[in-house]
Amino acid sequence: MNSMHPETLMVHGGMDGLTEAGVHVPAIDLSTTNPVNDVATGGDSYEWLATGHALKDGDSAVYQRLWQPGVARFETALAELEHADEAVAFATGMAAMTAALLAAVNAGTPHIVAVRPLYGGSDHLLETGLLGTTVTWAKEAEIASAIQDDTGLVIVETPANPSLDLVDLDSVVAAAGTVPVLVDNTFCTPVLQQPIRHGAALVLHSATKYLGGHGDAMGGIIATNSDWAMRLRQVRAITGALLHPMGAYLLHRGLRTLAVRMRAAQTTAGELAERLAAHPAITAVHYPGLNGQDPRGLLGRQMSGGGAMIALELAGGFDAARSFVEHCSLVVHAVSLGGADTLIQHPASLTHRPVAATAKPGDGLIRLSVGLEHVDDLEDDLIAALDASRAAA
């Protein structure tokens, strides 16, 4: 099926067997436990699943923490889109990141090389070493020299959160050598970027964002090879981090409209970035699709478009940023991203508050997640807020 176009895969991925079952959409199975055939085979099934294996035909799924059919459908669909062997879904994006780090620690490779900026929660988790990892923060050009004998992962996010910096995945994978590369692909989604095609071993999504697309379901998912999938499922089973069946249903449903949502929001974001760049209160607009912001030519080679995230830098630092955000009326002041409505936030105060002072976003930087509203209405609201914040200064 993965020979089909992505738009077709988004609609039909993970939908196998529905016609035979006499239904058009997957059922939501909320069972927390499942009957087992007998004592011996039930025990075998439990051990098989608890050690990270996939459910075998005819076996009992035993317990929802070990295996859930709706979650498995969502995983199948995302794996096809990311050109991966398998995918493993979790309760949140941070649960997915935690599982990857725990799997690295369990393999005796607790050292992580990471390129900033990352999502603030990922940065915080790595910086604390809470899971037994150690981290070397490196620039893209420093990855090869930062790798040690016990390095288990190289972690990057592109475009980066919240600066929209672009990372060359071909370069990163070459520098990492035999060390697996984990790419946070939340901002791009598989519509715009497929990191496995560039050699990444693991592709992580906060499925809460664009994959779900409506701000009403939380989840995380990692697309990867079969070896890593087994390791991640074992961590998931032991830690109890399984995605809830209702969340799996909503996220899987979100995939069916992902391409049209992503491209519509991207078109608006590109137009909005150009319009905002002319405002005197803004010192810089960061958006991959703007002229001069992709010097290495990653658009077209790695990404098929600039996405729907924008970062703005305001003259006047924190006070200007605070006033701007608080004067918005249509655009919602909230964390998260990738939903139908446009969201605005001040990363240094919110998502990136725990990040070390030397790596924290500037006080004048604002992150904008562009939604599905008309570009003229968004422009009117943002320009009015910029003008009001200047007048109040």
From Swiss-Prot:
<feature type="binding site">
    <location>
        <begin position="63"/>
        <end position="65"/>
    </location>
    <ligand>
        <name>pyridoxal 5'-phosphate</name>
    </ligand>
</feature>
<comment type="subunit">
    <text>Homotetramer.</text>
</comment>
<feature type="binding site" description="in other chain">
    <location>
        <begin position="206"/>
        <end position="208"/>
    </location>
    <ligand>
        <name>pyridoxal 5'-phosphate</name>
    </ligand>
</feature>
<feature type="binding site" description="in other chain">
    <location>
        <begin position="93"/>
        <end position="94"/>
    </location>
    <ligand>
        <name>pyridoxal 5'-phosphate</name>
    </ligand>
</feature>
<keyword id="KW-0456">Lyase</keyword>
<dbReference type="GO" id="GO:0005737">
    <property type="term" value="C:cytoplasm"/>
</dbReference>
<dbReference type="GO" id="GO:0019343">
    <property type="term" value="P:cysteine biosynthetic process via cystathionine"/>
</dbReference>
<dbReference type="InterPro" id="IPR015422">
    <property type="entry name" value="PyrdxlP-dep_Trfase_small"/>
</dbReference>
<feature type="modified residue" description="N6-(pyridoxal phosphate)lysine">
    <location>
        <position position="209"/>
    </location>
</feature>
<dbReference type="InterPro" id="IPR000277">
    <property type="entry name" value="Cys/Met-Metab_PyrdxlP-dep_enz"/>
</dbReference>
<dbReference type="Pfam" id="PF01053">
    <property type="entry name" value="Cys_Met_Meta_PP"/>
</dbReference>
<feature type="binding site">
    <location>
        <position position="367"/>
    </location>
    <ligand>
        <name>L-methionine</name>
    </ligand>
</feature>
<dbReference type="InterPro" id="IPR015421">
    <property type="entry name" value="PyrdxlP-dep_Trfase_major"/>
</dbReference>
<dbReference type="GO" id="GO:0019346">
    <property type="term" value="P:transsulfuration"/>
</dbReference>
<dbReference type="GO" id="GO:0030170">
    <property type="term" value="F:pyridoxal phosphate binding"/>
</dbReference>
<protein>
    <recommendedName>
        <fullName>L-methionine gamma-lyase</fullName>
        <ecNumber>4.4.1.11</ecNumber>
        <ecNumber>4.4.1.2</ecNumber>
    </recommendedName>
</protein>
<dbReference type="GO" id="GO:0004123">
    <property type="term" value="F:cystathionine gamma-lyase activity"/>
</dbReference>
<dbReference type="InterPro" id="IPR015424">
    <property type="entry name" value="PyrdxlP-dep_Trfase"/>
</dbReference>
<comment type="function">
    <text>Catalyzes the alpha,gamma-elimination of L-methionine to produce methanethiol, 2-oxobutanoate and ammonia. Is also able to catalyze the alpha,gamma-elimination of L-homocysteine.</text>
</comment>
<feature type="binding site">
    <location>
        <position position="119"/>
    </location>
    <ligand>
        <name>L-homocysteine</name>
    </ligand>
</feature>
<comment type="similarity">
    <text>Belongs to the trans-sulfuration enzymes family. L-methionine gamma-lyase subfamily.</text>
</comment>
<feature type="binding site">
    <location>
        <position position="367"/>
    </location>
    <ligand>
        <name>L-homocysteine</name>
    </ligand>
</feature>
<keyword id="KW-0663">Pyridoxal phosphate</keyword>
